[in-house]
Amino acid sequence: MILGIDEAGRGCLAGSLFVAGVVCGEKTALEFLEMGLKDSKKLGPKKRFFLEDKIKTHGEIKFWVVKKSANEIDNLGLGACLKLAVQEILENGRSLANQIKIDGNTAFGLNKRYPNIQTIIKGDERIAQIAMASVLAKAFKDREMRQLHALFKEYGWDKNCGYGTKQHIEAMIKLGATPFHRHSFTLKNRILNPKLLDVEQRLI
């Protein structure tokens, strides 16, 4: 059994960070690949929410989704929030899996305590359980930003999902930040450096 872990919302200017973990075996993973599972960034919202529902209701899958709010990110820092969320998933899921695979290139120093952790760059494209975790995290993030968009329509959160797009930054300059913005994420560099904006828009 493999425990796959991924996140959504790491680079956002607004809203929460979501980290998800999914445990299942090879047979179930294959079932989802046949349903069209892939990295959540390559799925449309309709397919993503469809797969989210299938993951959550599948009898052979265990999953966890941990939310860290903008306020927690401001108070603790993004790195600490990521580590705490991953650790919470590991505490819940490690006894069910003989392999732990995390998307990216860091185990946040947790590989000393959990020696069977493997970090995999672009893991959401290579490991089904990481792709499933990616789908859950992104679906939770999308849903949150759609709900917040109903309160603050000017920021375009239903489209940009909290990332620093041109429209989002222009709205922040004009209207200021909301209580759901990460105030520790300075906008100064993004406004002065259009290249950063281009990179962030490609991440959406």
UniProtKB/Swiss-Prot annotation:
EC number(s) stated in the UniProt entry for this protein: 3.1.26.4
Keyword Acetylation: no
Residues engaged in binding a divalent metal cation: D6, E7, D103
GO biological processes: DNA replication, removal of RNA primer; mismatch repair
Listed name of the protein: Ribonuclease HII
Occurrences of domain RNase H type-2 (ranges): 1-197
Species whose genome carries this gene: Helicobacter pylori (strain Shi470)
Broadest EC class assigned to this enzyme: hydrolase
Compartments where located: Cytoplasm
Classification via PROSITE patterns: RNASE_H_2
Gene Ontology CC annotation, any one: cytoplasm
